[in-house]
């Protein structure tokens, strides 16, 4: 158990979530001013003592200013370290650059590893994050990384829907790609439901029998039965939302009566909200790992569930030296 006082600070990425976490822990957010100089450099002023405290900085590195939010985090950590904070934990619900975690083409950087190096160099002692795009990213760090899963939140939500709306209607959990099968299966196992997988394969087609030109088309293959059932798509990131739209269209075509989607991180780039509004999805559920209240006003299908209780409990256990494994069960 830590004898050091727990203090929460935040940058400009998600003040609302920080305050909700503080409320769950029966404390208040610390006093820090994060702004910019006239030449756009990041300025951080910590207006209270952090000497010997167990400091938690809540800062998702998300849109609309991924790089600014990352820089704010690093500068805050440096300031706190120089002010003799006992331990610094970065609470990064959405970990920016997580999708750049491998060398997928010649001369490509592994930017996620670079970000991990920067965070360690700044002086971060521990990272708390949620549903990393790839769990192997934890290995990029030489410090503890607590990757909290949203499975319990999603399972609880589906069980509530089952009692209030689904009633006796069968439902099936769907992974929109091969890469997300493990995530979807974990939820289907807890709900004792069926699992379906959407596989999108490129198939080469010739323009004509006499032509030497060919092109690739995307072929959607559904593994599993959704006929007459409610399909529930499980994914970690909703970015352009084209995948969700194509998946919902394919599921309806295969006989699903309704399509729901539960996604951890709502990135929503470009016209993603318009794409969701135009899709066959009945309801899209996301967490508040990224601020999305403005998008909720534009999309009646969008529902946001809070992760404040999960993150606050993780922080409490880290502070007291308790196991965090059971939180995701």
UniProtKB/Swiss-Prot annotation:
<feature type="region of interest" description="Binding of phosphoribosylpyrophosphate">
    <location>
        <begin position="227"/>
        <end position="242"/>
    </location>
</feature>
<dbReference type="GO" id="GO:0016301">
    <property type="term" value="F:kinase activity"/>
</dbReference>
<comment type="pathway">
    <text>Metabolic intermediate biosynthesis; 5-phospho-alpha-D-ribose 1-diphosphate biosynthesis; 5-phospho-alpha-D-ribose 1-diphosphate from D-ribose 5-phosphate (route I): step 1/1.</text>
</comment>
<keyword id="KW-0963">Cytoplasm</keyword>
<keyword id="KW-0460">Magnesium</keyword>
<feature type="binding site">
    <location>
        <position position="133"/>
    </location>
    <ligand>
        <name>Mg(2+)</name>
    </ligand>
</feature>
<dbReference type="GO" id="GO:0005524">
    <property type="term" value="F:ATP binding"/>
</dbReference>
<feature type="binding site">
    <location>
        <position position="146"/>
    </location>
    <ligand>
        <name>Mg(2+)</name>
    </ligand>
</feature>
<keyword id="KW-0418">Kinase</keyword>
<dbReference type="GO" id="GO:0004749">
    <property type="term" value="F:ribose phosphate diphosphokinase activity"/>
</dbReference>
<keyword id="KW-0479">Metal-binding</keyword>
<dbReference type="InterPro" id="IPR029057">
    <property type="entry name" value="PRTase-like"/>
</dbReference>
<dbReference type="InterPro" id="IPR000836">
    <property type="entry name" value="PRibTrfase_dom"/>
</dbReference>
<dbReference type="GO" id="GO:0005737">
    <property type="term" value="C:cytoplasm"/>
</dbReference>
<dbReference type="InterPro" id="IPR029099">
    <property type="entry name" value="Pribosyltran_N"/>
</dbReference>
<dbReference type="GO" id="GO:0006015">
    <property type="term" value="P:5-phosphoribose 1-diphosphate biosynthetic process"/>
</dbReference>
<dbReference type="InterPro" id="IPR005946">
    <property type="entry name" value="Rib-P_diPkinase"/>
</dbReference>
<keyword id="KW-0547">Nucleotide-binding</keyword>
<dbReference type="GO" id="GO:0006164">
    <property type="term" value="P:purine nucleotide biosynthetic process"/>
</dbReference>
<dbReference type="GO" id="GO:0002189">
    <property type="term" value="C:ribose phosphate diphosphokinase complex"/>
</dbReference>
<keyword id="KW-0067">ATP-binding</keyword>
<keyword id="KW-0808">Transferase</keyword>
<dbReference type="Pfam" id="PF14572">
    <property type="entry name" value="Pribosyl_synth"/>
</dbReference>
<comment type="similarity">
    <text>Belongs to the ribose-phosphate pyrophosphokinase family.</text>
</comment>
<protein>
    <recommendedName>
        <fullName>Ribose-phosphate pyrophosphokinase B</fullName>
        <ecNumber>2.7.6.1</ecNumber>
    </recommendedName>
</protein>
<feature type="binding site">
    <location>
        <position position="131"/>
    </location>
    <ligand>
        <name>Mg(2+)</name>
    </ligand>
</feature>
<dbReference type="Pfam" id="PF13793">
    <property type="entry name" value="Pribosyltran_N"/>
</dbReference>
<keyword id="KW-0545">Nucleotide biosynthesis</keyword>
<dbReference type="GO" id="GO:0000287">
    <property type="term" value="F:magnesium ion binding"/>
</dbReference>
């Amino acid at each position: 158990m830590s004898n050091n006082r727990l203090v929460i600070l935040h940058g400009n990425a998600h003040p609302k979530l920080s305050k909700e976490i503080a409320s769950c822990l029966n404390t208040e957010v610390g006093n820090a001013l994060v702004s910019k100089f006239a030449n756009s450099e990041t300025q951080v002023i910590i207006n209270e003592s952090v000497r010997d405290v167990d400091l938690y900085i809540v800062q998702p590195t998300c849109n609309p200013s991924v790089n600014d939010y990352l820089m704010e985090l690093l500068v805050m950590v440096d300031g706190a370290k120089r002010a003799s904070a006992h331990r610094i934990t970065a609470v990064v619900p959405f970990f920016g650059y997580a999708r750049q975690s491998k060398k997928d083409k010649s001369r490509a950087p592994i930017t996620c590893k670079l970000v991990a190096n920067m965070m360690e160099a700044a002086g971060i002692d521990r990272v708390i994050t949620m549903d990393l795009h790839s769990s192997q990213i934890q290995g990029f760090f030489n410090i503890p990384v607590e990757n909290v899963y949203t499975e319990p939140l999603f399972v609880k939500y589906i069980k509530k829907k089952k009692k209030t709306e689904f009633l006796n209607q069968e439902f099936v959990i769907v992974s929109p790609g091969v890469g997300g099968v493990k995530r979807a299966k974990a939820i289907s196992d807890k709900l004792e439901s069926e699992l379906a997988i959407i596989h999108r394969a490129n198939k080469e087609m010739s323009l004509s029998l006499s032509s030497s030109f060919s092109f690739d088309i995307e072929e959607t293959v559904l593994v599993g039965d959704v006929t007459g059932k409610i399909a529930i798509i499980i994914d970690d990131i909703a970015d352009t939302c084209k995948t969700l739209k194509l998946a919902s269209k394919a599921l309806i075509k295969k006989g699903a009566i309704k399509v729901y989607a539960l996604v951890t991180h709502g990135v929503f780039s470009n016209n993603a909200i318009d794409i969701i509004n135009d899709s066959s999805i009945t309801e899209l559920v996301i967490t508040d790992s990224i601020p999305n209240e403005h998008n909720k006003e534009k999309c009646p299908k969008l529902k946001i569930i809070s992760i404040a209780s999960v993150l606050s409990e993780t922080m409490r256990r880290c502070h007291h030296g308790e196991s965090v494994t059971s939180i995701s069960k």
